[in-house]
């Protein structure tokens, strides 16, 4: 969404508030072109502050994960001072955020798991390119694969031991995957331990912008209207949505998690 569109909703002060929330500036990073045969999920599309706003993760945390001295991930696009994250980058960050905030994985354990997965899978972005599940009871991370024709789970946090499917709590309610196990849609939601999915991101819907699930309505547009003084009921009437859904969408942006 352009700053000009946002500006039409409110005052200059409200525009600046919106820009701060999503890191929008007058400088526009050049968007990389999709190369022949390249998966669109690997193409840089989001600035770090923008991705942080979409995931309700503090921007400083996202910068540390992608640009810090001991970073967890490498951004898909980096040219000089321009850094853009791909859909796969955002997927990996969201999985780490869910494990960190809702399953209490320590930073040391998360780093050990990410590094082990890269080595064992031989993939650049294994969290996005393989199907994984969280196991809250054992504070473990599990790589789901087929062994001797039977689908099993390998507990990477406990030295490769096998664990049973009945103990596996699916992270899959937040990360939808295609038949190859690649992430194809995210349902980022601040209350990720809830079964609700009011928001989604899909590379085939508005180029991966955060939208109200089941629609092509950008969530940032609703937030801009809220900053301009519109109530949830007024916004709901404009888009023929329920006020309760609008309130959930707006709450996603209201406060950052620690």
Locations of the language-model features?
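Short, Lys/Arg-enriched anionic-surface-contact patches
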Residues: 18-37, 196-217
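Polyanion-binding surface elements
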Residues: 37-62
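Short alpha-helical segment immediately N-terminal to, or the first helix within
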Residues: 40-41, 99, 224-225
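Residues within the helices of the helix-turn-helix
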Residues: 49, 115, 233
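DNA-contacting interfaces and partner/effector-binding or oligomerization modules
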Residues: 68-71, 76-155
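Hydrophobic packing positions characteristic
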Residues: 143-204, 208
């Amino acid at each position: 969404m352009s700053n000009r569109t946002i500006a039409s909703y409110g005052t200059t002060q409200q525009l600046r508030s919106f820009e701060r929330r999503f890191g929008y500036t007058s400088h526009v990073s050049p968007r990389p072109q999709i190369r022949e045969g390249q998966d669109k999920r690997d193409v840089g599309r989001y600035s770090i502050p923008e991705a942080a706003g979409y995931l309700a993760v503090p921007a400083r945390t996202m910068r540390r994960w992608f640009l810090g001295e001991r970073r967890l991930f490498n951004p898909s696009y980096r040219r000089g001072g321009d850094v853009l994250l791909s859909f796969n980058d955002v997927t990996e960050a969201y999985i780490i955020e869910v494990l960190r905030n809702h399953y209490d994985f320590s930073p040391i354990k998360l780093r050990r798991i990410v590094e082990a997965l890269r080595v064992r899978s031989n993939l650049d972005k294994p969290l996005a390119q393989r199907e994984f599940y969280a196991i809250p009871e054992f504070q473990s991370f599990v790589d789901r694969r087929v062994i001797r024709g039977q689908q099993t789970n390998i507990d990477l946090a406990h030295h490769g031991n096998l664990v049973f499917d009945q103990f596996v709590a699916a992270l899959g309610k937040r990360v939808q995957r295609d038949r190859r196990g690649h992430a194809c849609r995210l349902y980022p939601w601040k209350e990720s331990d809830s079964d609700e999915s009011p928001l989604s991101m899909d590379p085939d819907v508005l180029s991966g912008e955060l939208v109200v699930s089941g629609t092509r309505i950008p969530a940032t547009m609703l937030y801009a209207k809220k900053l301009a003084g519109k109530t949830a009921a007024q916004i709901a009437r404009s888009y023929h949505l329920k006020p309760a859904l609008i309130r959930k969408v707006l709450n996603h942006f209201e406060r950052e998690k620690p």
